[in-house]
Amino acid sequence: MINLAAMRLFYFPKTKPGEPQQVITHPIGIGRVGWRTPEGNTRIVSKTAAPAWTPTAAIRKEHAADGDPLPKVVPPGPDNPMGTHVLRLGWPEYAIHGTDKPPSIGLRGTHGCLRMYPEDIVGIYDAVPVGAPVTVVNQPFLVGWRGDTLVMQTYPVLEDEKRKPHQRTDQLINRARKSMQGGYGARANVAVNQALVAEITQNPRAVAVPISTGNLTLQQYLAAAPRVANRLPQNATWDGDMRRQLKAADLMKKAAAP
């Protein structure tokens, strides 16, 4: 499962009967404006380690116009935009792959493919078989149940999104109220903190916030959250030096890639 608005991949490994469902999630980079990642259902049709990259005619034309002509084939190696591993989708010319530009993860920097950190793509490549179904959605607002509490998680709406999710929040909440997981009866009639819903849809934080809890504000909820220590992902190469900081313009420059 890919949620473009969240810029995250969610993998649900098969479980044995009686075992809880495990979810593995990773951040991704997605298609930039003008090169949107498609939505819908597809499958993994092939996998390749150490892939070569054959840019499409449209990509080569774009780069030539920018004074950066591309070869017909980019061989495997550290400068290959596909990274070390690729899982090709049933949609021609689209794939889930690594990258030679890690700062582009979490940004819209691709020609429609889905990029992953070099340290993340390896595990997904090894775990996901050819033929596995893939669903790509664009859902900036998510509503569900955490025990008896209705929660809402919001992400920024993509800038070229034509649909209007802000106009459908009531419909989304009502569907969650009546969901089989949430149950019927009292849960279907649970009161919703509409002021908080408005606050988190206008100021998305990607945090699941309880929206059926009195007069709670977003700041109150965040202030009460337990503090945790940030840890580097496995195999990360950052040395902890906080003095080297990239500006937004530097990140976007690094994200621009074939």
Name what the model sees in each region.
Residues 1-104, 123-127, 154-253:
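Gly/Pro-biased beta-strand-loop elements
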Residues 35, 139-143:
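Short, charged beta-turn/beta-strand-edge "cap" motif at the junction between a beta-strand
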Residues 43-46, 115, 136:
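Structural signal for conserved beta-strand scaffold positions within catalytic alpha/beta enzyme cores
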Residues 111-125:
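Short beta-strand-centered segments at strand-helix junctions
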Residues 131-134:
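Loop/turn positions that initiate beta-strands
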Residues 257-258:
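Short, solvent-exposed mixed-charge patches
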